[in-house]
Amino acid sequence: MPGERKGFQHRVHREHRGEQTRWDIPRCWSETALDLNLESGNWKRFGGASGAGELSVVRFETERMPPSFDVRVDDLTGTRAEPRGGAENQSVSPGSGTTFYIETFGCQMNAHDSEKVAGVLLGRGYQQVADIEAAKVVFYNTCSIREKAAQKVFSRLGEFRKHPDHGKVIGVLGCVAQQEGEEIFERAPWVSLVCGSASYSKLPTLLAELEAGNRRVTGLDTDTDETFETEITRRDNPFRAYLTIIEGCDKSCAYCVVPYTRGPERSRSSASVLEEVRKLADAGYSEIQLLGQTVNSYRDPAARGMTFAELLVAVAAVRGIRRVRFTTSHPRDFGRDIVEAIDSVPALCDHVHLPVQSGSTRVLRAMQRTYTRDEYLEKIALIRSARRSISVTSDIIVGFPGETEEDVAETLSLLEAAQYDGVFAFQYSPRPNTASLQMGDTIPAEEKGRRLALVQDRQREIQIARNNELVGQTFEVLVDGASRRRASPAGGPGQWAGRTSSNRILNLSSPHAGLLGQYIQVRVTRASPNSLIGEHVN
């Protein structure tokens, strides 16, 4: 592809001659960044680079005005350079040029929220950096679903105690911010900004207040009007995009803080969802992951609007979209129409994440999960009856207050019955503002650990058996990075990693360079409990 690369370089030079001069590669692609080798003396190159022909996102910024252009280099469809987002939304604020850094804890929704935060600040002239040392403003976007996750945040904040003269603005965002509020200032006095997920559009104003001399500022409103309004101007992945379609939760599980930290369920209009999907497709994104705490509870707020299954089909029909994923589903709202949609639309990925939490009906009732063991297994049977082979993953909590040995045995037997392709298992931890907090933490930590090991060991046996059944089969894989098993430099021939439609990780060897972002055929040669190993099939 050398000729195409040169043409791309010339086009960029011609269209942006005299503008400043900087491009940077998003942090997650720093190992596999394409060296553009811009020849003009007006350009300055930042960051590392490696093998030719890879898919990269490159950022250009100007001195005259702030428009930022994300430029996609795509050797599959030919080279092109186009703006993503308009200059009219890029006005410079008094904080223009201030550097910020975001560290994200938790799930995909938090990762997507961090993209929203970056979008808000980039649109006001701030500059995102990948090195915390280079940042004037440091944000920790937090998770509080489990005690360990929240403790990790405060541990990270504690590192600043050793450096009182760091000179940075420290901000706590997300669920811990919403849950703890101003108490964070008491636990970590060097924090100066606390902002919940419903107030991210206010971040430039909060930062301006700090600049004006205020010592501490908060954005902890519960107003949900802005939930879906934040424009994403910079995404962390150049071919896979997150898109939140429902925020909050109405299920009120006894152990869960989400209704408190995220508020009640509210769905985005299908018209707005489809408009953004079309924009993403036009910008070169081929895989969309629809997000929600209970994503399948989606209901279009418009009169006689789309159901979740209808929305899945509509998103998959957008020209340029090759894969559609969704997470996380709640069993109560999971119906036959979703399975039928997956069965009939190839672009809908054949994977469902359906958390069960326990195999015991008695514990499920105590958890307020609104279904029984048998009702849940009926959902699994529905999924397994599909014509396509749909993979199923789940979440399990051990050590819930009052859980007995018999309850644990029922969970282990449910693993056998469900034959999951993957399980995320956790020890119960009491969380503030939850019903289970009043039940006490009745299971000793050592016993929780023993029960967790039982679940993990049994599930490991199931996964290796299921993965071994796939040896010899060929799957389409979206290559999304260099494999941890690689023996050659990132971007060169050797080891790559990607995901199948069923969301299995597949490490693969290939004689070809430049596979990042490509859909390729891979034959499985070996299996492990958590991934597959295969060879690129030409």
Question: Positions of the model-derived regions?
Answer:
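Short, low-complexity, charge-dense intrinsically disordered segments
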Residues: 3, 10-21, 27-39, 43-44, ...
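Proteins enriched for Cys/Gly/acidic motifs involved in redox and nucleic-acid/cofactor modification
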Residues: 57-298, 307, 337, 342, ...
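Terminal RNA-binding accessory module
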Residues: 69-71, 438-538
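Short, solvent-exposed loop/turn segments at secondary-structure boundaries
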Residues: 149-151, 264-269, 299-305, 366-369, ...
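Flexible glycine/acidic-rich beta-alpha junction loops that bind and position SAM and/or redox cofactors
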Residues: 181, 292-301, 334-337, 356-367, ...
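Radical SAM/AdoMet-radical enzyme domain recognition
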Residues: 309, 314-318, 323, 335-394
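Intrinsically disordered, low-complexity polar regions and short flexible loop motifs
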Residues: 326
